[in-house]
Amino acid sequence: MKELEDILRKLDEIKYGWIDINGEVHLNTMKDFRKIYKTMSIETVLDRKIGICMEQVFLTHILLDQLDIPNKMFCTRIYEDENFNDLDAHEHMHCFSLCYIGDFVYHIEHANQEERGIYKYSSEEEAISKINAFYEALDKGRARPVTEFFDVPEGLTFKDFNLYINSLGEYNK
C-alpha cells in the first residue's frame, strides 16, 4: 500500500525521543521519563522531529485522516491506578494505530524500531491480539489491557496520560 509506505517514510523523519519540562531533548532513553515528560503538540513533533509512541501514533492518526483512511489508536500497558506514584518505575506502555483498507487491518509500527514496518491482519481482533501478545511477552506474561483512545492532549505528564487512558475503559484483556 503506497499510502502506508509514504506514512512510514514520513515517520522516519521523527526520532524516538522527547522534550522534558525544561526543554531538554532526550533521545532513545526513558531516564526520568515519569518525572519530567510532558506530551508534545503535533506542531512540536514535526518542528523538532522527535516523539515517543504516543506522539508518533497521533501523527499517524492525523496523516491517515488526511488520506480518508479509517483508523483507530490503541494503548497497551500494565494497568496503573490513580494512586500509583513510583516515579522511578519502568514504563510498561505502548501506543499503536490500526487502519482499515478493504477487508484488511494494517498496523504501521515506527516507534519500536526493532519492529518497524507495516503489518497486515485479517481483523482488528487478530491485530490487537498479536500486538498485545508481543508486549505481554516482553513483560514476562503480565496481562496488559488494551484501550482505544482518541487524542493526545498537549502537556500531559505520563501519569496524566495513563489516567486519561484509564478513564476510557478497557477494550480487551
Outline where the language-model segments fall.
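Generic low-polarity alpha-helical segments
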Residues: 1-16, 64, 96-97, 106-110, ...
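Secondary-structure boundary elements
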Residues: 1-47
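Intrinsic-disorder/low-complexity loop/linker signature
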Residues: 22-23, 33, 84, 103, ...
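Hydrophobic/aromatic-rich core segments of domains that either
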Residues: 55-137
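Phosphate/dinucleotide-binding and metal-coordinating scaffold of catalytic cores
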Residues: 48, 79, 158-159
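A generic hydrophobic-helix recognition signal that picks specific residues
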Residues: 48-49, 102
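Alpha-helical and coiled-coil interaction segments, frequently adjacent to or embedded
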Residues: 10-18, 37, 83, 118-172
